Amino acid sequence: MAVPKRKMSRSNTRARRSQWKAEAPTLVKTIENGKVVYSMPHRARVVEDAAGTPLYMEYKGRKVADV
């Protein structure tokens, strides 16, 4: 196992850790039933009826799963 030669200072430790940050997800704007909906690209979406009841999941215009 690798062992550091010298103790790493608090500022250097924090500077290194500051590079580990989460990115905001990429969202795609679509219009469904007259409403603007933001969703993640390349994901199956849930198709709902007018009452909001989930019917099935769809990907690239094809039904892929029942909900």
UniProtKB/Swiss-Prot annotation:
One BP annotation, GO: translation
Basic residues bias spans: 1-19
Signal peptide: none
Keyword Signal among record annotations: no
Keywords: Ribonucleoprotein, Ribosomal protein
Gene Ontology CC, one term: large ribosomal subunit
Highest rank taxon of the organism: Bacteria
GO terms, molecular function: structural constituent of ribosome
Disulfide bonds: none
Pfam families on file: Ribosomal_L32p
Annotated region described as Disordered, given as residue ranges: 1-21
Family membership noted in the UniProt record: Belongs to the bacterial ribosomal protein bL32 family.
Protein's recorded name: Large ribosomal subunit protein bL32
Organism: Clavibacter michiganensis subsp. michiganensis (strain NCPPB 382)
